[in-house]
Amino acid sequence: MLRVLPRALRLPCSWRFSGARDCASHATTRTPEIQVQALTGPNQGITEILMNRPNARNALGNVFVSELLEALAQLREDQQVRVLLFRSAVKGVFCAGADLKEREQMSDVEVGTFVQRLRGLMSEIAAFPVPTIAAMDGFALGGGLELALACDLRIAASSAVMGLIETTRGLLPGAGGTQRLPRCLGVALAKELIFTGRRLNGAQARELGLVNHAVAQNEEGNAAYHRALALAQEILPQAPIAVRLGKVAIDRGMEVDIASGMAIEQMCYAQNIPTQDRLEGMAAFREKRAPKFVGK
């Protein structure tokens, strides 16, 4: 089941969630490349971003990037979003990376500008205030893997193929890959993977720690999505403010020395002390019941 965002937070008509009324007659008939679904019922709080550019295997083109940036800008203001899950509506592919056909038509200046914009997109994903999960049910190459690396958690089908393959195309990772991969795997291994342009399957990626979980693919081709959804369901019952602050403490702490990181943790902890959710958690423990967190 899906819910519709409050009017102030709705996406443009062509991005309305499934089940919403048809857009006004002036709306474009073009299928949006980014679709947003907010789940309801027991999954309320989980919002999905579906990448849907089948003719280009979800390649990162201008329209794709623009729609994704706009979706993120609106969703980050929606307090009902507790987990953001990235998945593909195209079977067999997560995101094939840069749209090289589109890029061939750009001047050198335009290429530089677009890559800078792409880098900004990945930074927006990384800075999203709630946990983000990439469900990788197929190819995640180049910029596609950089998108997944910008997420907090990654789930892959064992048969999924991923890699920063830019050096095989005369390029280098330009949307955060040279920075996030070594932070994920360590410098030496990241260099090896980038220098060689090596591709990994989901099982290999799990062995290296590149993904959190690898699962056998199913006939529908969405096994990683189902595992990612199960992980999101584990996050949902937890105190949302504490989860957000935990993400801030980890992300900012990883950028500094441990003493500074401890100071960041202290500041985050101090922000959580006066919350209703902390008091509810203490009361629930004392009364031996499940807590009911409200995000306040």
From Swiss-Prot:
Database matches in Gene3D superfamilies: 2-enoyl-CoA Hydratase, Chain A, domain 1, Lyase 2-enoyl-coa Hydratase, Chain A, domain 2
Site feature location: Important for catalytic activity: 146, 166
CC annotations in GO: mitochondrion
Subcellular location field: Mitochondrion
Record-listed N6-acetyllysine modification sites: 101
Residue positions where N6-succinyllysine is found in the record: 101
Main location: mitochondrion
Transit peptide: 1-17
Statement: the UniProt record of this protein carries the keyword Membrane: no
Keywords: Acetylation, Fatty acid metabolism, Lipid metabolism, Lyase, Mitochondrion, Transit peptide
An annotated GO BP: fatty acid metabolic process
Sections of the chain in a coiled coil: none
Gene Ontology molecular function terms on file: lyase activity
Similarity-based family: Belongs to the enoyl-CoA hydratase/isomerase family.
Protein name, as recorded: Enoyl-CoA hydratase domain-containing protein 2, mitochondrial
